[in-house]
Amino acid sequence: MRAGKKVGICMIYALFLFAVTYVLMLAFSKYRPYIAVGSAAIFIATGMLPFDQILGAIDFNVLLMIAGTMGLVQLFIDSKMPALLADLIMEKVPNVQMAAVALALFAGIISAFVDNVATVLMVAPIALEICKKLKTNPVPFIISIAVSSNLQGAATLVGDTTAIMLGSYANMSFLDFFFYRGRPSIFWAVELGAVASALILAFLFRKEKGAIPKGAARTKVTDYVPTFLLVGMIALLISASFIQNKPEITNGLICVGLMAVGMIYTFFKTHDAAAVTGPLKAIDFETIGLLFGLFLVIGGITHMGVVDAAAGLLAQMGGGNVFAIYTAIVWASVLFSAFIDNIPYVATMLPVVTSLAAGLGIDPTVLYFGLLSGATLGGNCTPIGASANITGIGILRRDGHEVKTSDFCRIGIPFTLAAVIPAYIYLWLMYGV
């Protein structure tokens, strides 16, 4: 009895420290990396995250992907390709409003097949170039790109880690995300949400009616090799998703490896040390530090049973009503994923959902899809709810722009609601009725 009470008290301590950490990060956006790392140190020092679990809590694959892609993207920027793409987009859209929506949709398309963080790192430079040419604030542009990439992460098997987890757990193939058991699958639910959220973005940018100047000379690309390397990265990341039992850091090694290839190529071409120092300087170590700290914090509360307790509470909320359970899973997933990494949450909830469905004697598909859609989209509610958000904010900070929590939520919350509600209804009609 005493042991159980002690565990309960420790869980409360962990939950309290977790809550304080996130409140401080929301309130003091400039100091998020230091707050996260400081909180992680407390979790370790107090034993709430044991030493032997530290390495397991850190997602080195994500950190390597961010570092490698940032370096490769710097070579991409130096080649002038983002400036050319910005010119092409500006030629096709009538005003700033449609430029913002077009960039968000473009990011979403890429993100359906490539990791969300990599997508933001690739598309953000194009957005920054457009904003510089138009002399407009890039903050809402980058936020829109980040939330759109998060939305499309659930569209395909290779779009996001959580989608990969569900595919593996439920033995779903790449094509099962399009049509599953003879019915339109979750891909179409996500695209329905994408249409609704695009309308929301158009409304949020409704005042940006400034005309885009036409007739300007297109930027000349100085080197196409970085572009080929980025396209190669996309192809390799997609291909790697089909490899069974691959090392967990495979994607990270792909990104870092291609960055190294780009640096070596550029160095031998230019004989300039900037070919090496430039990409390395482009790596946002503050963003990496923030994610490093958050991985440890999430590892701490997971070890202390907070995530398991939250999953158990969610399982009890619906009672025996399937629609109530489905509703609870979707919206609780949205809420939890706004503040914690959705990877440990989804990993914990998948067996919970399976046992719930078995107990009720129902097909778990609707609960699986509800879990994935809610957990993937919930991260769009807050600036620290998803790695793509943190990455986008890091890019803006390096460009000299600070992002307030209110700035992010002004776009993130209505975007989330517009994306989740249609998907929530669609999935129930397809698989729940």
Task: Show where each model-derived region lies.
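Membrane-embedded alpha-helical segments and adjacent helix-loop junctions characteristic
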Residues: 52-139, 290-360, 364
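Short aromatic-rich membrane-water interface segments that cap or initiate transmembrane helices
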Residues: 176-187, 316-320, 324
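Helix-loop-helix connectors at the membrane interface of multi-pass transporters/channels
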Residues: 127-133, 168-170, 353-359, 391-403
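Flexible loop linkers connecting adjacent transmembrane helices
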Residues: 79-93, 131, 173, 208-214, ...
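Hydrophobic transmembrane alpha-helices of multi-pass small-molecule transporters
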Residues: 1-77, 180-312, 403, 410-433
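Membrane-interface alpha-helices at helix entry/exit sites of multi-pass transporters
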Residues: 97-102, 132-144, 174-185, 359-369, ...
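Alpha-helical transmembrane segments and, especially, the helix-loop junctions at the ends
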Residues: 111-121, 138-176, 197, 334-350, ...
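Hydrophobic faces of alpha-helical transmembrane segments in multi-pass integral membrane proteins
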Residues: 38, 42, 68, 72, ...
